[in-house]
Each structure stands twice: as structure tokens, then as C-alpha cells.
Amino acid sequence: MKVLQILPELDSGGVERGTLEVAARLVDDGHESLVISNGGRLVAALENAGSRHIQMPVHRKALASLAEIPRLRKLFAKEKPDIIHVRSRLPAWLTWSAWKSMDRRTRPRFVTTVHGFYSVNAYSAVMTRGEAVIAVSQSVRDYILTNYPQTDPAKIRVIHRGVDERVYPTGFTPANDWLAVWNAAHPGLEKRIPLLMPGRLTRWKGQPDFIRLIARLIALGQPVHGLIVGEPHPKKLAFLAEIKALAESLGVIGHLTFLGHRSDLREIMAISEIVYSLSTDPEAFGRVSLEALALGKPVIAYDHGGVAEQLRPIFPQGLVKLGDLESAIDLTGKILKGRARPLSIKDFTLARMLDSTLAVYRTVLTRPR
């Protein structure tokens, strides 16, 4: 089986990581893996794992991108993949436009993955045009059927994103060298209780609620310290200044550390007592929360979207009503006192995700054209 995955770029993020994971599994199983993107820092890792990469500007939202359609059609005819798997809207439009003009009897099978709650319009509808459509959560499946009711429910397969338990083992402890560097960079933190808020710095991710939570816990006498991991989009740097001003106004700027982008989030989660997901809009999935649960860390999250789907079978006591900060504060105290721990992530493993994805490929290949 030859599988061609297409996405805008290979820099960082859940879509990109999932692409590399599927590619590596294909190679390990003896299949041929090819990825088209505009490139990025993950290309080397992709190629080192045995896949081929073809760089094309499939990321540009411009009229010039239409020139890629005949190039893609020519490439599909040359490479003859069995499966084309697209993971983003612009590449999906370019791919679909090239694919639909090919001979129906011999063209590759067309698979899409809906990774998020896209704005509802004709542009986003292309993600439902796959001969098989993968939804990364039940919430995303519901979004598809609610907003694109013409989509055949039978062709949608829910495949939750998965975590590699070898990389995120329960009870993981950072290396001594890492701990030494961390403690030197953050003196005195070992005397506090670290609480972690990971995620891109943007309003809907919930950092303001986390800062208010830290302020209330400090007022209640809890010796906590908030760790905020993530950076804002370059065009939204004002939000970082805004939440720092909020921390100043609440008198807790000294009880927070803004860590920016980190490549050692696993280690930071491991030394944190609780990890938070306080997004005011539902997450399509929320992979970082699952990684924390895999490490055995309690997660406190608002009860909606893909994160709630993870917590219900693994750590249901970590769910609080959307916006109910008082309940999140009370729950924090109870967890710190009782040291509750999540159950196994057995239904959300990387192996299960990859098995299910390859099963979709095999199934769509057997369907009538």
C-alpha cells in the first residue's frame, strides 16, 4: 500500500505530529509513505523514519495556489498512491480539485481528517468530501453531522488521537540533569506546589481563568505557583501583556512563571501536581491533556469538547462545568489533599490510533468506486 499525506507545513503541532506517526507506522509495516507539504523543521525527522517528502507550496491562501492543481494531478498520476490523505482545508481543496478530474476507475482513494471545529462555510465543507472521513473526537463527528447534514454518517470514523505510552509512561521522572537545570532556573519553586497551564496564548484557551484560579488559591493560603507554557501568535502579542497585567492587578505576578514555548513540556508536566485545560471554546481533541493523563497527572478541565471525552473514562472527577471557576478551585484543593490519580489511557494509545487509521485505509480500498 502506498499512502500520500498532504498538509500545509511540517513545523509543529498536533496535525504535524500525527502525520509523522502515521508515516512511521506505514514504513514499519512495509508500506510506502509519501508526504507533501511546504516543508518545516519536522521534515528531517520524517525522512529519517523512512518516508519521502515533496515540498510544494500547498499552504498559501492565494490565487497563485491554483497553479498547484495541475502539478498535483501530474504528481498523482506519476506516483500512483493507493490512498491520498488530506488533513487541512487548503490542501484539501487543491487535492480534491486535482483528484476529481482523474479517471474514477483508477484514481487514488481520497481520505480526509477533520482535526477541528472549522468555521461553517463552503470552504470548510471540502473536509467532508473524503470517501472516508476521520473525526478526531465524537465532538467533531457531531459537528460534521450538525453543520454538514449531507455527509453520510457511515463514512465517518471517530479515531481519537493517541499517546505513545513509551514516551509518556505513568510515573515518569525527569532526568537529574534536567532537574538541576530547572531548579537553577527557578530557585525556590521546589518549596511551592506547581500547577500547569499549557497551551497557545490566546483568549479562548483560558489563561485568564487560570490566573484568577491561582489568585484565589493564594488568597486561601495554598502555597501554589502557576506555570504558563505557550506563546502567542506573533500578531497577538498584546494578549501576553494583557494577562500579565491581569496577574499584576490580582497581586499574583510573583506566583506565576510565563515559560513561553518549551520543547520539554513532558518534563514540566511531570514535576507539576495538576495540569489544567480551561478552554472557553471546546477543544476538538486536546492532545496535551491526554499526555498529562498518560503520565499519571490529574487534569482539571471544563466539561466540553474532546478533552471531556478523554476525562470521562480516565479521570471523570477532573471535570467541572464550563466557567465554574469556584468548582475548579475547590477541586484543586481536594486533589492536592487526596492525591487522586487517573486511570489507564488504554482507549487513547498511539498504537490504537494507528491501527484504526490503517484499518480505514484498508476498508476504503475495498469499497466500490
What is each stretch, according to the model?
Residues 86-92, 114:
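Short His-centered aromatic/hydrophobic patch
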Residues 13-21, 193, 200-216, 238:
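A conserved mid-protein helix/loop that constitutes part of the nucleotide-sugar donor-binding site
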Residues 313-326, 333-337:
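Conserved acidic donor-binding segment of nucleotide-sugar-dependent glycosyltransferases
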Residues 100, 104-138, 150:
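A conserved, positively charged/aromatic
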Residues 235-240, 253-262, 268, 319:
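Active-site donor-binding acidic/aromatic loop of nucleotide-activated sugar
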Residues 270-284:
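Acidic donor-binding loop of glycosyltransferase active sites
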Residues 41-47, 227-253:
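Short, structured helix-loop element that forms part of the nucleotide-activated donor/catalytic region
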Residues 35, 298-301:
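Short hydrophobic beta-strand element within catalytic cores of glycosyltransferases
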